Amino acid sequence: MLKIIIPTIMLLPTALLSPKASLWTNTTTYSLLIATISLQWLNPTYFPHKNMTPWTGIDQISAPLLVLSCWLLPLMLLASQNHLQQEPLVRKRTFIVTLTTIQPFIILAFSATELTLFYISFEATLIPTLILITRWGNQPERLSAGIYLLFYTLISSLPLLVTILHLHTQIGTLHMPTLELTHPLLTHSWTGTLSGLALLMAFMVKAPLYGLHLWLPKAHVEAPIAGSMLLAALLLKLGGYGIMRVTLLMGPLTDRLSYPFLALALWGALMTSSICLRQTDLKSLIAYSSVSHMGLVIAASMIQTDWSFSGAMILMISHGLTSSMLFCLANTNYERTHSRILLLTRGLQPLLPLMSVWWLLANLTNMALPPTTNLMAELTIMIALFNWSTPTIILTGLATLLTASYTLFMLSMTQRGTLPTHLTSIHNSNTREHLLMTLHIFPMLLLMLKPELISGVI
């Protein structure tokens, strides 16, 4: 554990002390090295927890998410180079330091076996994210987006803190493996239900559940590219991971606790997919598609079967890589045309032919084309939900159909059609961008060959 966390923390002096010429090279290479070392966590184990320290441990649910979080840091640095070109050196260093600060907190959140540490690191990721959005966002609305993010997250996580403290007074320990043996909140009383609700609510907002998702499109649209990648690929996964952890703690959920969440998640997957079909803003479209995918993850986590957990895990990892790649592609368009409106950025295929190949690949993985891991995840979740209740096949089937529709809509709008007249000169795509897309799609292609690495078998 420490052999990843300590090098990650040492990225801070690297960013602060590197000379101007080699600042990006040093930090990106160093973080790629950390990402490569973290791949050993995927090594299958016969023990439920490995690398155990008194506070942290890795099992098959957290290992894939930990590797994903290490893998994305160099990609965020690669993606941010262009839009920070005009900034003074001090601000570049500050930006890299802010990005790097989030990393140890995310690693701790995914590997904590102690609920207090989990809560602290879960909340600590909020501060650097807020700085990223409110300082490096593009429009003045970024302040409103930051306030939405802050208040949604804080209001939902205060009951979580109270319940964690209540658990500690009730049982005397907050060690997760111990709590899993006791199932502390199994009462059918209203207090038990309220405690369960308080535990779940913080993660439902983070995931986000439909109805509690209003902060997400705002935050995504206003954030810089690194902020969007961070939100889509890692912070939403913190919500999904928290739900899986907490539902394991609570044992079988009562009907009155799980039904509303299940109904909202599945209905939300349908509604947000429909919203995507009439979006004009590219980043907003990708943000709503994230809500739709995470709705399936929430629904799967709520029914608490091995198959559903496995499907939720695969979907979280696949969606992390896919949506991050889509945001990078949207950003490459934005940097050239200075617009996110789909009507103003259409018909780019003749001008950027190689980029349109990446667009095609990203969209095909997003709409769950076989044999991608997205398809395996969606099928597993659909089967688990169908097994739990037959009518859910209508909702999941429609959601899948709408996903394919809005993905093709996004592809045709950005790549096809006549080129708008105001686009007179567009820079060619460069090697850095192609490397960035390759590093997104390469893990996806490799995971197709061995999806059990991320299937999180409990």
Curated annotation (Swiss-Prot):
> Which top-level group of life is the source organism from?
Eukaryota
Which UniProt keywords are present, listed alphabetically? Answer: Electron transport, Membrane, Mitochondrion, NAD, Respiratory chain, Translocase, Transmembrane, Transmembrane helix, Transport, Ubiquinone
Example GO CC term: the record gives: mitochondrial membrane
Main localization is mitochondrion
Keyword check for DNA damage: no
Location in the cell: Mitochondrion membrane
Q: Which GO terms describe its biological process?
A: ATP synthesis coupled electron transport; electron transport coupled proton transport
Q: Where are the coiled-coil regions?
A: none
Its placement in the membrane is given as: Multi-pass membrane protein
| The protein's Enzyme Commission number | 7.1.1.2
Q: Which family does it belong to?
A: Belongs to the complex I subunit 4 family.
This chain's protein is named NADH-ubiquinone oxidoreductase chain 4
